[in-house]
């Protein structure tokens, strides 16, 4: 995947690489289930922690490649929340932005948390709490994995969820 377009002054890309149809799909309200090949598929609800360059890129990839991801994963994936301290007026995902991790942790629909904040804190605390709540976590945060990977893998195992990292 290659991103096109340019970032704004905060390093945010928005939906620079999407075509108009992908934008319409991303903004459409979904009932949480869809029919494909005669089978009902449950919508997997995800949250992204951080909406900088990496987090906005994750949101963009999930939005622009929605159908391909659903086909490969077996279920469609929808970003329900984006955790960030900032607001993003005019962004296609502005209504998904929340400022309190508790919103994500307390929502039983959220099954996947994508940690894109980087660094040790609050990434460690938020990842740990998500795993304790039974939510799978994925990250590319090498510092977090190096410092706490064994503990987070153990927590995932104990809570019957997954901890994915690259």
Where in this protein do the model-derived segments appear?
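Rossmann-fold NAD(P)-binding glycine/threonine-rich loop
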Residues: 123-133, 140-166
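General beta-strand structural signal in soluble alpha/beta enzymes
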Residues: 97-98, 114-115, 138-140, 163-166
